[in-house]
UniProtKB/Swiss-Prot annotation:
GO terms for cellular component: ribonucleoprotein complex; ribosome. One of its GO terms (molecular function) is structural constituent of ribosome. Keywords: Ribonucleoprotein, Ribosomal protein. It comes from Buchnera aphidicola subsp. Cinara cedri (strain Cc). Belongs to the bacterial ribosomal protein bS21 family. This is Small ribosomal subunit protein bS21. One of its GO terms (biological process) is translation. InterPro entries: Ribosomal_bS21 (IPR001911), Ribosomal_bS21_CS (IPR018278), Ribosomal_bS21_sf (IPR038380). The keyword Plastid does not apply. PANTHER family: MITOCHONDRIAL 28S RIBOSOMAL PROTEIN S21, SMALL RIBOSOMAL SUBUNIT PROTEIN BS21.
Amino acid sequence: MPIIKIRDNEPFDVALRRFKRSCEKAGILSEIRRREFYEKPTTERKRAKASAIKRLSKKLARENLKRIRMY
């Protein structure tokens, strides 16, 4: 859990913004959303495999686009 120390003469809004930013960097909200409902291990593996395939296809598309621009 991210911890921030409130500085002297620091407005509450600024401290809250710093806390939200540190939570975002730590990935707490995405972790909570991911664990909100139980997901079967097979479904979890299937989702991970699908995201890996999607990442790979994006990478290949970017590399292919670079090759086309060279000529």
